[in-house]
UniProtKB/Swiss-Prot annotation:
It comes from the Eukaryota. GO terms for biological process: carbohydrate metabolic process; defense response. GO terms for molecular function: glucan endo-1,3-beta-D-glucosidase activity. One of its GO terms (cellular component) is side of membrane. PROSITE patterns: GLYCOSYL_HYDROL_F17. This is Glucan endo-1,3-beta-glucosidase 3. Belongs to the glycosyl hydrolase 17 family. The active site is at E116, E263.
Amino acid sequence: MAALLLLFLFLFASSALSQDSLIGVNIGTEVTNMPSPTQVVALLKSQNINRVRLYDADRSMLLAFAHTGVQVIISVPNDQLLGISQSNATAANWVTRNVAAYYPATNITTIAVGSEVLTSLTNAASVLVSALKYIQAALVTANLDRQIKVSTPHSSTIILDSFPPSQAFFNKTWDPVIVPLLKFLQSTGSPLLLNVYPYFDYVQSNGVIPLDYALFQPLQANKEAVDANTLLHYTNVFDAIVDAAYFAMSYLNFTNIPIVVTESGWPSKGGPSEHDATVENANTYNSNLIQHVINKTGTPKHPGTAVTTYIYELYNEDTRPGPVSEKNWGLFYTNGTPVYTLRLAGAGAILANDTTNQTFCIAKEKVDRKMLQAALDWACGPGKVDCSALMQGESCYEPDDVVAHSTYAFNAYYQKMGKASGSCDFKGVATVTTTDPSRGTCVFPGSAKSNQTLGNNTSALAPSANSTTSGCIPKYYHHPHASFGDLTLLSLLLIIALVFL
């Protein structure tokens, strides 16, 4: 019976992961206070996001994703494209340093070579396919070509006459690049990567495209757009653009190349002339898009064929140049607070970013370590926090450093005090966050995971307010000079206490 139960749970979890992995997020870094890679990963895990796209191959970020199972798209930045395209050795070195050094611990699935090269870096268009081929050859040499795909993201503006979709075609100016590119994608089994922004199509249409049509809002049957050639009905701009890409490939006799949408989103704030960049519209678009993708609705041309889609983007990038809207595409602020709460009823756990009622207290990283240690000692002593989880061999002992241990103790005190104002300060060395700091089997007080692991046994979280015991002895929480004898005696006392409880 136990074996059957475990099998059921495994199959259930696998099914949920498969469903949720259709949605990913882009992680831009043009941010004033960019969270650390470990904080980024913690936020992604709390939101059940299993796919990400990076705009480079940052070492610290790739290390943070190790052993998480998150599927990662890494990128060759545009400024490295020329060098990659001119030398097989340069491409091989890039793959060695940025792929082989991390795979398979970090689940790199795709290498995006450049970004919107045909429309934003036109002078490099002629070398794009060469760069793709050199990277592919390097993967073959490293025996990684079956696990990792190579492609390049395009702006949807390379497609002309996108409505009706059946008449769409690629800008013929780029035929010398597009045709060999599609041949490469077909021969390697790689997807066409496409950036799809109904927001820009709507704004540039000057009122021709209805807002509801851009936002996936329900339309009356007589208001749906109909392709007169195929009689296919289109209820949203997103599907029309994706199908336009399918038809454009068909026009060139490529019919079996899948499409992955590498960017799509809606800005939540704009300048005086950007009237439709609002929180309500951003929430509506992204909520409806995620529902649409997760439900595997597909497109009118390919119904039931899910289009893996990456939301643009995880954080607001406040240092990006351009209009106000360019700085406000994020789902979250850098402190982990959601910009808005997505409406995802029935869409599962992914991006369930209503974290407004789930707050935690963590230690600040760039503060005096002696002040942290003093605050930790107070929390585990006079503060009456149960710090037993920080003992050597227990679930929260690793990493054995004062920041990690202080975070656990500070948060336990904060939760015990009912998140009262002032209970997360500790003389300036602590701060409140909405990102769950739990990791692996180390489940923090206040985490939604604590209900799964502890049930109703809240005694493990913190001692009673009436307790006369300290809950811990300061010296066995990040104290490198505690002796083996001290630890053994304390462990023995704990065992005796547990026996007689």
